């Protein structure tokens, strides 16, 4: 299977994330998909702290154990929260822009890779 990574010209979410990091402002991302209803995501929500997350989301992070894989990590907010808890987390994304933001924000192990890349063969205890 050939793995797919995004190019900057086809990465509106990555562009919004890196723009928000650089300028501290962005409006909403409109998400269109044949797999679910149209949605709007306020970009600042992608930069929330653990304390700003809903209680269900906080609980999900607290229940993560062992070696954790954060798939589609975006800006790295979950990876950063897990790191603050002292947990071992690898954050992956197919967006080079998002991976750059994760590096700038201090995510310890951000990687530009597709989950379905046949060369990605590590094992994890928790997948988020």
Can you say where each PLM-predicted feature lies in the sequence?
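N-terminal auxiliary segments of SAM/dcSAM-dependent transferases
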Residues: 1-32
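Conserved alpha-helix/loop element of class I SAM-dependent methyltransferases that forms part
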Residues: 47-67
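Conserved SAM/SAH-binding loop
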Residues: 75
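Conserved SAM/SAH-binding beta-strand->alpha-helix loop
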Residues: 95-96
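Short alpha-helix immediately C-terminal to the canonical SAM-binding loop
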Residues: 99-100
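Conserved SAM-binding strand-loop segment of SAM-dependent methyltransferases
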Residues: 106-117
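A short acidic, Gly/Pro-enriched loop at the edge of an enzyme's catalytic core
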Residues: 118-127
